UniProtKB/Swiss-Prot annotation:
Ranges annotated as biased composition (Pro residues): 175-201
Tissue specificity: Ubiquitously expressed.
Biological role: Plays a critical role in cell cycle progression.
Expression induction or repression: Expression increases from G1 to G2/M phase.
Keyword set includes Nucleus: yes
Ranges in coiled-coil conformation: none
Protein name: Proline-rich protein 11
Chain segments carrying region Disordered: 20-43, 174-201, 340-360
One of the GO BP terms on file: regulation of cell cycle
Entry keywords, A to Z: Cytoplasm, Nucleus, Phosphoprotein, Ubl conjugation
GO CC list: cytoplasm; membrane; nucleus
Motif (KEN box) on chain: 316-318
UniProt gene name: PRR11
Amino acid sequence: MPKFKQRRRKLKAKAERLFKKKEASHFQSKLITPPPPPPSPERVGISSIDISQSRSWLTSSWNFNFPNIRDAIKLWTNRVWSIYSWCQNCITQSLEVLKDTIFPSRICHRELYSVKQQFCILESKLCKLQEALKTISESSSCPSCGQTCHMSGKLTNVPACVLITPGDSKAVLPPTLPQPASHFPPPPPPPPLPPPPPPLAPVLLRKPSLAKALQAGPLKKDGPMQITVKDLLTVKLKKTQSLDEKRKLIPSPKARNPLVTVSDLQHVTLKPNSKVLSTRVTNVLITPGKSQMDLRKLLRKVDVERSPGGTPLTNKENMETGTGLTPVMTQALRRKFQLAHPRSPTPTLPLSTSSFDEQN
């Protein structure tokens, strides 16, 4: 907002200056010398110079400009354009804020983009520093002489805080500002880099003499943890059981004793039922799906007048409701017949030889 107000003030001041200039020019154009008096009627001949002067005066009077209207139009257009740009900026800012509130990932994307840009800048700077270090190492490898190296003139603006790589850890950087040769002598070149260490040979355990020779050698602590011959020789092994011993301890399934033998089965004695139900009770009261149990324990003797068949007599009169067998009676008779004549008689209970009529 302050930038926008400052810009609007500048535009207003510029428009006022232009307006004042136009007014001054218009006022000066009005102060023109008056035209010469018209010729007298006595003169008959008119010179060409007078005609041209009169025509020029007429053209100058007809060339009338409207600077005020143009300046006003420009001023209003500038104001409208500034208001339009201000509204557009406000709308875009509000939309950006709304988008950031609805989608918070946009902020993360912007931050990530800025971090990427910074990373690219740092990477480019690092590449430049690595190139500078390479050139310094090349210049240090030249033989030392009384004069400075020919490459030192190209590296006067090397920064002091340089990220040193592992390979160039011992390289000494020159100072940032070149020293004048009159006050101090040129600095000596840095010492050459040490040669890289040779690769380690693989450890081979073929003979005890080689193992002892390797055991006496020094160990490097800089690298990762290594298993030496001494560690292998000091390892103690525990005695384990072989497969044959384990098989002897675990008996085979054939050698196991059987859980139930024939003699055990022969010594088993079955107890007979103390109270065997009569054929009439088993044939009539017990259904094939139920277990055979003595129902006389659950019954209680009651003094009730009974019919010869055993059913209790009631006060209701036995009235015949119809002739013939009903479906319920046929089902009851069929069930009674099946109970009296089972298909697979049990060996414990004797077969009933009495007929269906005798049982009734």
